[in-house]
């Protein structure tokens, strides 16, 4: 080969070898850097054949298999209702009866575990059965108190002349507590199972804002405090009916685990077997009403899949 031609080829090949060396070094460095990032931000799954698969790290309250638990406190409101009473010697209805909740005065009872059932509280435990969809077990401990200072419409019959005489012009005044005291204060317990859909609204390094909405269905397990016609007060737990609700919440999650939850819900309660005496007589009451509730509290969420 002609010597000038060989010199030209040599001059052309030297830069190409240098570029190839730089490219290989760059690829090795980028592989190291991105490999380190994968280990810290992704899920690593090893297979039997030695292949390692990397999956994106999921947001909190978003992925199948995630779990959360929550405890909080509520305020409730109730529509007026008709309450029908039946028993030995009476069958009557009080119409358009008003009621309210009974929140406990702010104090140590809200954080003392030995007193937690005294306050109006909520508990939730949720499991994500698929991405962004959770099955949620809930206990809503509300308190329902009939307003004593009211006069209500009366229809029906009472055989006892003492209490029949308290009905004047188709109405009865409840203010003196002689005719009736009626409350579910230990409490108006709504044990429910719900489905909730979750959507991540804001995702930052250590903070997530997540919106959820859903519906629930359950049974009513109140401890009703009822005193009718001076009888012994009924005060016992009993499955009295059913309830259903629609709910929506905002969840602030910090460092992927700790959460603050604020929720609003509206629902319907129908109780057809409220015990009104301590014995096993057929004395009972029934009522149905619409309720609203706002609640807030703290919780914790975690993944059942582990990260590197």
PLM region descriptions:
Residues 1-44, 308:
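Bacterial Sec-dependent N-terminal signal peptides
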Residues 37-127, 293-295, 299-307:
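Short glycine/proline- and aromatic-enriched beta-strand/turn motifs that initiate or cap beta-hairpins
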Residues 55-57, 108-111, 177-183, 228-237, ...:
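Extracellular loop and loop/strand-boundary signature of outer-membrane beta-barrel proteins
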Residues 60-65, 124-227, 299-304:
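Gram-negative (and chloroplast) outer-membrane scaffold detector with strong preference
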Residues 63-67, 117-121, 185-191, 209, ...:
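Residues that define the transmembrane beta-barrel architecture of outer-membrane proteins
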Residues 81-87, 148-154, 223-232, 273-281:
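Outer-membrane beta-barrel translocator domains and adjoining extracellular loop/strand segments
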Residues 81-84, 90, 249, 253-308:
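Predominantly the C-terminal beta-signal and adjacent terminal strand-loop region
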Residues 98-106, 169-177, 224-230, 274-279:
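Flexible, solvent-exposed coil segments and beta strand-coil junctions
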